[in-house]
Amino acid sequence: MAISKEKKNEIIAQYARHEGDTGSVEVQVAVLTWEINHLNNHIKEHKKDHATYRGLMKKIGHRRNLLAYLRRTDVNRYRELIQSLGLRR
């Protein structure tokens, strides 16, 4: 199931840097993280769903690239984001 409009707006409101911000790296990573967690739960239940697994891997790669970009450009924002999302230990 795709992310609902209400849930997406809730995530955007939490991570937006300014009013109407939907494209900042923080927002994109937060939305991808929610989708990845959702797909991860699906994969645990449906182990043979290879198409969904491939989509999950693509989302993980996209998030990894966005995080690498943020880390290169602004380390403090990167650290705040991974701490707030609970990524990496």
Swiss-Prot record:
One of its GO terms (molecular function) is rRNA binding. SMART domains: Ribosomal_S15. One of its GO terms (cellular component) is cytosolic small ribosomal subunit. HAMAP family: Ribosomal_uS15_B. Belongs to the universal ribosomal protein uS15 family. One of the primary rRNA binding proteins, it binds directly to 16S rRNA where it helps nucleate assembly of the platform of the 30S subunit by binding and bridging several RNA helices of the 16S rRNA. Forms an intersubunit bridge (bridge B4) with the 23S rRNA of the 50S subunit in the ribosome. This is Small ribosomal subunit protein uS15. It comes from Streptococcus equi subsp. zooepidemicus (strain MGCS10565).
